[in-house]
């Protein structure tokens, strides 16, 4: 059997990883400033993380959600305390797309409506509902196009108000920072207005924090810079540091009913053990503060680099727009300097390193970037 060929792949096969480093099968060492799409939050193969998973696997790795699992409540309690959402409820699933799909369902259940407001250039996932609210027709099959969705410009509150005034909106969904689009963020003032408009009109606001959450921006969630509390928050990626897990944080305004949501694998013992270890390490190593400080340092130094046209983002979720003559720098960094970075629309370089990255590793990147653009 062959693999279904849908991925554009680099001719590199990592076989080992530790901290902010990966090694390929030839033994070449790479500095990882991408973390596999912002998944690696506490660093590759963190000892506490590895120990937690191994010990749990030796006890019980899985049983379905037909029995008690105290690890789920331990995870919910720690996540609530660290994120500032102790009064919310947690639904556990397996991925970001699944988290967003369930968030959209919850909003529709509550309002009895089905039309969704999303934002141009958004990316929310590849399941039927999430791909419908993703502004990319090339990944939408005819089957996905029956959903009622309207896309408005980011930071355009008038367009949001106009759509909500029609009275048929089930929810508004927005990314804490748009990642795939090229690192574009809603302004704090816009998020405050959006939160106010949604609350006034009883329209649930869903904050997709799958890429921007879990401390990446220097706060636990990116929307917390705006001091708002959305109705639903979704998370995944950095939540499991590579182990598949997703979560939906749900306001007390939503009433749980048996069977309204469900999953076979979501919240299994291994996934919870991984996610608990991630939260423990984030606290013990002050990784949210490190993300803020290292992000500030990165932006400060990048602003001194003549080849850089623009820098966007917060903390360790940054987009670097280089001048056109340096369009091949990402390839040069990967194949000559052995540094992984990410891409986004319009040639933007995305930096999404582990939250544990050191100033020394950032300096290596900055030095190589300057050399390649001199």
Regions found by a protein language model. Give the residues of each.
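Conserved N-terminal phosphate-binding loop of PLP-dependent enzymes in the Aspartate aminotransferase
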Residues: 1-374
């Amino acid at each position: 059997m062959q693999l279904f060929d849908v991925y554009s792949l680099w001719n590199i096969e990592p076989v080992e990883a530790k901290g902010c480093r990966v090694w390929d099968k030839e033994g070449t060492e790479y500095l990882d400033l991408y973390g596999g799409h912002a998944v690696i939050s506490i660093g590759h193969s963190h000892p506490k993380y590895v120990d937690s998973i191994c010990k749990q696997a030796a006890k019980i790795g899985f049983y379905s959600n037909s029995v008690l699992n105290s690890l789920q409540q331990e995870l919910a309690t720690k996540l609530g305390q660290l994120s500032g959402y102790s009064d919310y409820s947690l639904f556990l699933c397996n991925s970001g797309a699944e988290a967003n799909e369930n968030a959209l369902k919850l909003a529709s259940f509550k309002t009895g409506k089905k039309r969704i407001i999303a934002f141009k250039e958004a990316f929310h996932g590849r399941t039927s509902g999430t791909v419908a609210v993703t502004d990319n027709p090339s990944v939408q099959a005819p089957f996905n196009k029956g959903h009622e969705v309207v896309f408005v410009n980011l930071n355009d509150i008038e367009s949001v108000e106009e759509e909500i005034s029609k009275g048929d909106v089930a929810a508004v969904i927005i990314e804490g920072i748009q990642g795939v689009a090229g690192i574009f963020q809603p302004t704090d003032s816009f998020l405050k207005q959006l939160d106010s408009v949604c609350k006034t009109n009883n329209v649930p606001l869903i904050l997709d924090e799958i890429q921007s959450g879990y401390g990446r921006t220097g706060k636990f969630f990116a929307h917390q810079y705006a001091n708002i509390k959305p109705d639903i928050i979704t998370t995944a990626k950095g939540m499991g540091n590579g182990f598949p897990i997703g979560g939906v944080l749900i306001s007390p305004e939503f009433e749980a009913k048996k069977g309204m949501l469900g999953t076979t694998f979501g919240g299994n013992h291994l996934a919870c053990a991984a996610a608990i270890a991630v939260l423990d390490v984030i606290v013990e190593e002050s990784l949210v503060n490190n993300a803020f400080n290292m992000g500030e340092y990165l932006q400060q130094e990048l602003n001194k680099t003549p080849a850089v046209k623009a820098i966007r983002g917060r903390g360790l979720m940054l987009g670097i727009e280089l001048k056109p003559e340096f369009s091949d720098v990402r390839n040069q960094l990967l194949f000559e300097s052995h540094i992984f970075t990410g891409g986004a629309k319009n040639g933007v370089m995305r930096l999404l390193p582990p939250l544990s990255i050191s100033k020394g590793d950032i300096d290596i990147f900055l030095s190589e970037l300057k050399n390649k653009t001199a």
